[in-house]
């Protein structure tokens, strides 16, 4: 009866591996959230300020940036892109770590715009700038935007920064940016310990675990029936 025994061991091994994958799928997470806003900063767009950003500091253990968001309102529409770059204390440092497709902000009243990065790996303790810019979408009338902010410095790991760089994106990495003392943008930035750019296996529901245990019980019962039948013959 060596074959059934090996079959049982294989089933148990699969169960152990499955349990291990379930545990590993429970990723750690961390969020920077400076909401709700108590102030606003304007004016974002052409021919006004082309780039608004927020400096953040990556935290050890959760260094994959999965998504971030800004709150924008406008009386017209603004076409822009969202970016992530390293920060050296005064300006952005290449290469570009994340660049969104063209985004369009519309409507009076602050709307939250979220950018999913598919996982950007950051270095713990290092500063980065999350920013929105119209420099690569510098269209006439692409203006009248206001960004939600906080005026009470709620986030110690960075601050609000901006640049009047017009259509010249290269100035962002060659010229010091400006800032408002004590201000942060109203942002939400979500981090995890997932592998950058990788899909994380979903954590199974209790029903899935029940099916697994039921299946293993069925395997054991089937082997026992085979043993009884072999004794009868």
Give residue spans per PLM region.
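Beta-sheet-rich sandwich/jelly-roll-like modules and their strand-loop junctions
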Residues: 26-91, 120-122, 126, 133-200
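Short, threonine-centered small-residue motifs that mark membrane-proximal processing/anchoring sites
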Residues: 9-10, 14-30, 191-214
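Solvent-exposed, conformationally flexible loop/turn segments
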Residues: 108-110, 125
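Solvent-exposed serine/threonine-rich low-complexity stretches and specific carbohydrate-binding patches
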Residues: 95-107
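C-terminal membrane-anchoring or membrane-association module
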Residues: 220-233
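Twin-arginine (Tat) signal peptide motif
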Residues: 4-6
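Exposed aromatic-hydrophobic patches
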Residues: 111-119
